[in-house]
């Protein structure tokens, strides 16, 4: 129902979702015919709640904005996080003055009044493979971003609703005093959040090994809390009722502290219902109990399954339920078979379309360590650090040692395969067939057929992704910068022109933009290496993420204009990779020739240090279409190209993001392109593309597409279907 109301974007998706809903309701009525009226009422409630949550309330700018100290972060005199404007949750950001930080450190809620603000709709993903933050925040009932330019702080008295947020903030500061790895596990287990970017490498390691669910996603630690309280109650000779009440009260508090994290709520609801059925002496199967947990969770949160963590948490528990009679190894295989289709779709924010075929082995080895060492030790540290701070001298070496071991194994990439992205229909097909394979009786012939179907499906999908029938030229939307992917069909060759990147003006290093945009874009297509990367010039918006690229994906050759190696800034980016990648300096007249594609260099004519006027300029032909790329080359350079080459092209990437310093009218007249492309950022401070350039295009009747408006722009060609141009953001074909 959540999918029908909130996620389905095509008739096919609505049809499949309705079909599953009908089957689900039919099974419920078949099993519980006497309760058909209750089932109908439940469906009515869920439908109503879904539509209520879909409704958008109008923001009343000017009303006070309420901010809780545990929901915002301050960095480099800048704050960002979540706030509430009347009944609407919003993302907020602004400059953090001294009075703001002072009030924030008091833990209680603060009100912002008399403010000036700019309200924006949260942008959806504008690149294939990119995580969609618009959908993510919609699952948290957040649709708007409020950028504060000025504000005043209005003091208010503490209310009962403030206490949970105050306790969360207190625990955040409490954990902040712990060493890095102890802090990491304590925050994940209690608050269901990672407090620091310093632990990004460890999270990536858990992801690559396929054991990310061991953290807060699965809610495994709830059973440890319950066992701890029961043991304490037994030691204190409390009655069963008193122990149950303590468990329920503790779990409710922890649900609030975890900010209603789906895995924790799921595990807690399971305990609540178990207690209820036991006290009422109602016999119910574990499968039916899981169904009741799901339904009650959905009533509580109709947007539940917009959350990837919720999908994985329930899928894991469902897998445990249908494989409860299997051995440990076979059960691990079942769990990974169910989770894999989800991880290859774009539901999951940190997976990037890669799977590890040794995940079963890693789970078999690491789960016992996690359950019997990490979880109990975290539990002990959390509750004893306040009175025995020296305990971290014991815990930190253990946590660090296990983290180092995890990072070491992950760095080896044993079993890790970049599979690529599958679509929603393929995901459903794989899940359904896998479930039937698991739950059907032992019909050997039927099971053999189902196994063959699953294996055949995965193999077919893999080959279609890795040996595509079409090639492409894709202008990746990296904001104010350039990054263009070029691939050939079948025995695919992959080339990148520039990497994109941003200047870092803050004190702290930010995660490279490449990790959020370019790598997911590549991995979604199953691209795990690049045959060559062409570097136009030294600017950060063109090659700022080069080091991050070389650190994470194999590159065979780096092509650049001769003289760039004399630039120390450039050499810093490639130091440490000189043994792994071949450097190829180029000048006008040089040719980079491969079996399927040849790049001709038309600029520069002399070595330089990589300034705009030294931009490497390339032309090549794909499917009888001539392309030209000139980096940030100015008009003087364009005239030099005119003087040496009589170029006419079909497609041209406009120089310098559409700046008036490039795109000379005479140059464009000579090129006579049927379409030009502009790569520029939204609301960029340079005003690109300049109106003068757009007027030139209009005067010459040259149409254009801009990543600023269209997101990633992809030109595809195929021997079977000809050529097409698609724009990802608008989703249309031109």
Regions found by a protein language model. Name each.
Residues 12-15, 25, 32-39, 202-360, ...:
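Hydrophobic alpha-helical transmembrane segments in multi-pass membrane proteins
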């Amino acid at each position: 129902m959540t999918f029908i109301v909130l996620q389905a974007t095509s008739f096919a998706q609505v049809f499949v979702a309705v079909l599953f809903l009908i089957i689900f309701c039919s099974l419920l009525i078949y099993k519980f015919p006497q309760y058909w009226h209750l089932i109908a009422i439940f469906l009515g409630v869920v439908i109503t709640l879904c539509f209520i949550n879909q409704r958008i309330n109008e923001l009343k700018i000017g009303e006070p904005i309420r901010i809780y100290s545990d929901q915002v972060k301050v960095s480099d005199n800048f704050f960002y996080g979540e706030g509430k404007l009347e009944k609407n949750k919003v993302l907020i950001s602004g400059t953090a003055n001294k009075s703001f930080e002072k009030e924030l450190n008091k833990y209680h809620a603060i009100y912002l009044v008399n403010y000036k603000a700019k309200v924006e709709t949260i942008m959806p993903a504008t690149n294939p493979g990119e995580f969609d933050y618009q959908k993510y925040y919609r699952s948290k009932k957040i649709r708007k971003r409020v950028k504060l330019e000025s504000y005043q702080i209005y003091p208010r008295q503490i209310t009962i609703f403030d206490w949970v947020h105050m306790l969360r903030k207190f625990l955040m500061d409490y954990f902040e005093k712990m060493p890095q790895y102890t802090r990491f596990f304590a925050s994940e287990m209690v608050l269901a959040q990672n407090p620091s970017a310093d632990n990004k490498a460890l999270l990536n390691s858990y992801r690559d090994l396929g054991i990310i669910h061991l953290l807060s996603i699965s809610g495994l630690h709830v059973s440890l809390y319950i066992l701890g309280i029961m043991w304490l109650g037994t030691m204190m000779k409390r009655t069963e009722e008193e122990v149950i009440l303590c468990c329920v009260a503790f779990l409710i508090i922890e649900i609030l502290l975890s900010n209603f994290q789906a895995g924790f709520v799921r595990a807690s609801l399971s305990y609540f219902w178990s207690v209820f059925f036991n006290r009422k002496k109602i016999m119910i199967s574990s499968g039916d109990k899981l169904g009741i947990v799901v339904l009650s969770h959905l009533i509580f949160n109709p947007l539940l399954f917009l959350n990837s963590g919720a999908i994985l948490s329930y899928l894991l528990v469902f897998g445990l339920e249908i494989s409860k009679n299997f051995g440990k190894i076979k059960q691990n295989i079942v769990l990974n078979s169910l989770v894999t289709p989800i991880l290859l779709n774009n539901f999951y924010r940190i997976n990037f379309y890669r799977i590890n075929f040794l995940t079963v082995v890693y789970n078999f080895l690491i789960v016992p360590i996690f359950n019997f060492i990490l979880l109990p030790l975290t539990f002990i540290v959390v509750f004893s650090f306040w009175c025995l701070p020296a305990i971290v001298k014991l815990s930190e070496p253990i946590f660090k040692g296990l983290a180092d071991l995890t990072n070491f194994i992950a760095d080896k990439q044993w079993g890790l395969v970049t599979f690529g992205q599958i679509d929603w229909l393929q995901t459903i097909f794989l899940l359904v067939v896998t479930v039937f394979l698991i739950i059907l009786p032992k019909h050997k012939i039927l099971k053999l057929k189902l196994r063959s179907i699953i294996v055949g499906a995965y193999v077919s999908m893999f080959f279609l992704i890795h040996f595509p029938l079409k090639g492409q030229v894709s202008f990746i939307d990296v904001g104010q910068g350039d990054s263009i992917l070029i691939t050939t069909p079948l025995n695919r060759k992959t080339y990148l022109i520039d990497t994109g990147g941003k200047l870092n003006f803050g004190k702290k290093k930010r995660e490279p933009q490449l990790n959020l945009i370019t790598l997911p874009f590549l991995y979604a297509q199953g691209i795990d290496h690049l045959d060559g990367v062409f570097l136009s010039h030294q600017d950060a918006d063109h090659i700022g993420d080069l080091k991050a690229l070389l650190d994470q994906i194999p590159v065979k050759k780096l092509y650049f204009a001769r003289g760039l190696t004399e630039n120390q800034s450039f050499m810093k980016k490639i130091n440490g990779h000189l043994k792994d990648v071949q450097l190829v300096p180029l000048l006008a007249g040089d040719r980079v020739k491969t079996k399927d594609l040849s790049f001709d260099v038309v600029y520069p004519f002399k070595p330089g240090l990589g300034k705009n006027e030294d931009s490497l300029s390339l032309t090549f032909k794909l499917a009888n279409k001539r392309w030209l790329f000139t980096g940030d080359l100015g008009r003087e350079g364009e005239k030099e190209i005119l003087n040496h080459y009589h170029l006419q092209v079909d497609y041209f990437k406009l120089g310098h993001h559409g700046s008036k310093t490039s795109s000379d009218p005479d140059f464009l007249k000579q090129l006579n392109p049927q379409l030009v492309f502009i790569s520029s950022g939204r609301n960029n401070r340079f005003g690109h593309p300049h109106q003068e350039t757009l007027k030139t295009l209009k005067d010459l009747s040259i149409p254009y597409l801009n990543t600023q408006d269209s997101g990633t722009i992809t030109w595809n060609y195929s021997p079977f279907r000809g050529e097409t141009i698609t724009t990802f953001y608008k989703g249309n074909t031109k």
